[in-house]
A protein has these predicted regions:
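N-terminus-centric sequence/structural signature that marks the extreme N-terminus
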Residues: 1-104
Length: 104
């Protein structure tokens, strides 16, 4: 199971966030990514790879100032991905990446 941690606000530093986030690394030991949100906040994702381990498939995914993290597996995502690929350029082969263009 992956680890997801988020914080909205400006009263803690990136270093403090990372210190606490590192305590959950056993839940997502394969890769880690932390993103600072311009409006004030931090979101982190530690990955437990199920469908491959590429840097392009690393979350949070970003599209038009929207961030997405997903701790799940989307079954039957390929037909949806094919339909969306007519208007959206996918950066990875991750099943979860379909959620951002679906949201928009």
């Amino acid at each position: 199971m992956c680890s997801i941690m988020g914080y909205l606000g400006t009263s803690i530093s990136m270093e403090e966030f990372k210190k606490h986030f590192d305590e959950t690394i056993s839940r997502g030991p394969d890769m880690q990514k932390i993103v600072e949100i311009e409006s004030g906040g931090i979101i982190g994702f530690e990955r437990l790879s199920i469908m491959g381990l590429t840097k392009e498939g690393m979350q949070p995914f970003e599209l038009n100032n929207n961030l997405l993290v997903c701790n799940g597996e989307i079954y039957c995502f390929r037909p949806i991905r094919e339909r969306l690929s007519e208007t959206y350029h996918f950066m990875s082969t991750s099943d979860c990446e379909i959620l951002l263009p679906l949201y928009e």
